[in-house]
């Protein structure tokens, strides 16, 4: 369960004062990932590419304590678990939202991913774990290549968010440009940079 904490009791105290009421507290980083290993595993094990990337996102975030905090309204909340959100095309042709609880067991994460994305697609009902988990949002624009995307500050959803398009085939590798948006109250640029480095490392050693 999430619980409200006093920002003054955390390392985010000064960031809370500086950024909670800023006109636009969201920051976006851009990075090109080498996803060659994910392509190989996807083909070898017949696993979905986006599932593998979501798994690596959860694993990369899990060791960074800032990912267990999130500003919600005027409060700073602390979580015990992380979930990764994926957008699903449902049976009506529209999109639904599906949160997958992160586990460091790839087989279990894959089972949950397949089970709940199919369920959401059929029922057209979102699966929301935000009451219990700090959710990392993701969106895959698979119809085209994109260089990046900058989100907007809604003032409602402060969750970290990643977006990507099609991966790009190079001579000896596959590249994937990604955008990572985060709330400055939750983390600083150094934490976001560490996460993106972790993400590349997790992709390489999966």
Located regions from the model:
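Domain-scale detector for complete catalytic domains at protein termini or as standalone homologs
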Residues: 1-13, 22-24, 36-41, 58, ...
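Gly/Ser/Thr-rich phosphate-binding loops and adjoining beta-strand/alpha-helix segments
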Residues: 6-8, 20-52, 68-84, 135-136, ...
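Acyl-group handling in specialized metabolite and lipid biosynthesis
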Residues: 26-31, 38-44, 95-107, 187
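Acyl activation and transfer enzymes in specialized metabolism, enriched
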Residues: 38-63, 176-195
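Active-site loop/lid in soluble adenylation, ligation, and acyl-transfer enzymes
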Residues: 48-54, 58-70, 75-76, 92-96, ...
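Helical lid/core segments from catalytic subdomains that handle acyl or acyl-like groups
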Residues: 90-144
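Histidine-centered acyl-transfer/condensation active-site motif
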Residues: 130-143, 160-197
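Active-site cores that bind ATP or allylic diphosphates and position pyrophosphate for catalysis
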Residues: 147
């Amino acid at each position: 369960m999430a619980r409200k904490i006093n920002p003054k009791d955390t390392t985010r105290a000064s960031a809370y004062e500086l950024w909670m009421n800023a006109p636009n507290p969201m920051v976006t980083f851009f990075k090109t990932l080498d996803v060659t290993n994910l392509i190989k595993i996807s083909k070898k094990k017949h696993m979905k590419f986006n599932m593998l990337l979501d798994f690596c996102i959860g694993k990369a975030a899990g060791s960074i304590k800032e990912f267990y905090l999130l500003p919600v309204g005027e409060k700073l909340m602390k979580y015990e678990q992380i979930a990764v959100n994926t957008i699903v095309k449902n049976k009506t042709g529209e999109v639904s939202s599906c949160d997958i609880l992160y586990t460091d067991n790839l087989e279990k994460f894959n089972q949950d991913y397949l089970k709940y994305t199919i369920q959401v697609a059929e029922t057209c009902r979102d699966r929301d774990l935000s009451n219990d988990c700090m959710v990392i949002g993701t969106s895959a624009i698979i119809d085209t290549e994109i260089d990046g995307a900058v989100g907007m500050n809604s003032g409602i959803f402060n969750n970290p968010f990643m977006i990507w398009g099609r991966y790009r085939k190079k001579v000896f590798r596959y590249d994937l440009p990604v955008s990572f948006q985060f709330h400055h109250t939750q983390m600083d640029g150094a934490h976001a940079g560490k996460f993106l480095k972790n993400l590349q490392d997790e992709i390489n050693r999966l």
